[in-house]
Amino acid sequence: MNRLDWQPRGLWYAAEGMPAEVWKDSLNKNPAAQYVSGPFDIVPLNDRDTLEYGGYTLRCIVTPGHTPGHMCLYIPEEKLLFSGDHVLFDITPNICAVAPGDDMLGEYLSSLEKIRKLDIAVTLPAHRGTGKVDVYSRIDALEAHHQKRLEEVLDIVRRSDGINAYTLTGLMRWNIRAKSWEDFPAGQKWFAMGEALAHIYRLCVLGKVRRQLLDDGHVVYHAV
């Protein structure tokens, strides 16, 4: 993704209530937006494709959620899962909406259930620690976390009918070193907004929240 690819997302966030100075500052300070990617060769992989490395056969498990194309790798004989950023043990993976009205959170939750069906003894995440619990207990915890988040977002919408996503994001609880929403670093506001939208859109899919497009192009939300 190059820098120009981020401009439509900024305009989308603006329609969801993020002030222009905030999303532009987020764009300027986001390391991922600083690099223009050149062309390179790729080898597309699909669910249940296999890779052969070091005498092991790794099965590809497509697990959209953290990103649309996220993939875990599984070695059935070893009961070993390379979980990437799909399952992390000491933080919750960031689940952001990637397009207006999508259901990335719904896809993530479905992907967790997909992993639950595997026979796994060892889980190796992309970063941070492996934790002190098995992957199935961690899946339970991640699902409970997002259920709690959905309830929090729905409660905010019920108490603030016609709220926009940016204002709602500022009313959510965040585990970050900042005294208030106004003190959040611009880059963190960007990620927080994406995560809030993922939960809002999930509630829309569930029929608990309604999305309204105003005449001026901005979007607000109502509890159903």
List each model region and its residues.
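Active-site HxH/HxHxD metal-binding segment of metal-dependent hydrolases
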Residues: 1-52
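Metallo-beta-lactamase
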Residues: 22-42, 57-152
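Short acidic/glycine-enriched loop/turn segments that link adjacent beta-strands
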Residues: 45, 67-68, 216-218
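Short, acidic/polar N-cap/turn motifs at the starts of alpha helices
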Residues: 47-50, 70, 208
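Short polar/acidic secondary-structure junctions
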Residues: 50, 64-65, 214
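Conserved hydrophobic "DFG−1" position in protein kinase catalytic cores
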Residues: 53, 73-75, 211, 223
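C-terminal regulatory/interaction regions
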Residues: 155-224
